[in-house]
């Protein structure tokens, strides 16, 4: 399971001109389920991103997590994170989870995030979305939790 974390001052997701999710300071997280992922990988990814210390403390050092700050989470499904660009000029997405599996894992990820964190907004799975954000830093961090027994390529 993969997440691309972006520390933001604010972010929102629009579908057909309607805002469906909006946060102030916090994390915009693009989320991708890969083939072979289970709820265990989703849980580990969420635990990692909630505790990752990428927000400044009083001394200006990255020493606080989104949980520490009470910042928002904006979770957006993004199967293209699983792109394989090694051959040719057209990316392959065969490593992304099948749509039904991806939806199930994304829904689990969102439900668990809502159980653990006070401010969680989302996009809409498989929708054409426009994501607007104001990066803070910028700080952008890729996370990947691979299923046991698989080779971890990339972030």
Swiss-Prot record:
Keyword Hydrolase (UniProt): yes
Subunit structure: Homodimer.
Role description: An aminoacyl-tRNA editing enzyme that deacylates mischarged D-aminoacyl-tRNAs. Also deacylates mischarged glycyl-tRNA(Ala), protecting cells against glycine mischarging by AlaRS. Acts via tRNA-based rather than protein-based catalysis; rejects L-amino acids rather than detecting D-amino acids in the active site. By recycling D-aminoacyl-tRNA to D-amino acids and free tRNA molecules, this enzyme counteracts the toxicity associated with the formation of D-aminoacyl-tRNA entities in vivo and helps enforce protein L-homochirality.
Cited PANTHER family: D-AMINOACYL-TRNA DEACYLASE 1 (PTHR10472:SF5), D-TYROSYL-TRNA TYR DEACYLASE (PTHR10472)
Source organism of this protein record: Paracidovorax citrulli (strain AAC00-1) (Acidovorax citrulli)
Taxonomic superkingdom: Bacteria
GO MF assignments: D-tyrosyl-tRNA(Tyr) deacylase activity; Gly-tRNA(Ala) deacylase activity; Ser(Gly)-tRNA(Ala) hydrolase activity; tRNA binding
Catalytic activity: glycyl-tRNA(Ala) + H2O = tRNA(Ala) + glycine + H(+); a D-aminoacyl-tRNA + H2O = a tRNA + a D-alpha-amino acid + H(+)
Protein name: D-aminoacyl-tRNA deacylase
EC number: 3.1.1.96
């Amino acid at each position: 399971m993969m997440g691309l974390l972006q520390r933001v001052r604010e972010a929102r997701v629009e579908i057909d001109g309607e805002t469906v999710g909006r946060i102030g300071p916090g994390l915009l997280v693009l989320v991708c389920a890969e083939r072979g992922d289970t709820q265990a990988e989703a849980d580990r990814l969420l635990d990692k991103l909630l505790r990752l210390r990428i927000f400044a403390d009083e001394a200006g050092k990255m020493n606080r997590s989104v949980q520490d700050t009470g910042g928002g989470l904006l979770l957006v499904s993004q199967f293209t994170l699983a792109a394989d660009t090694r051959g040719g000029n057209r990316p392959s997405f065969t490593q992304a989870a099948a749509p039904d599996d991806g939806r199930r894992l994304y829904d689990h990820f969102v439900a668990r995030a809502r159980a653990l964190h006070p401010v969680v907004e989302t996009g809409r799975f498989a929708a054409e979305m426009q994501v607007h954000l104001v990066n803070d830093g910028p700080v952008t961090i890729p996370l990947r939790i691979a299923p046991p027994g698989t080779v971890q390529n990339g972030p």
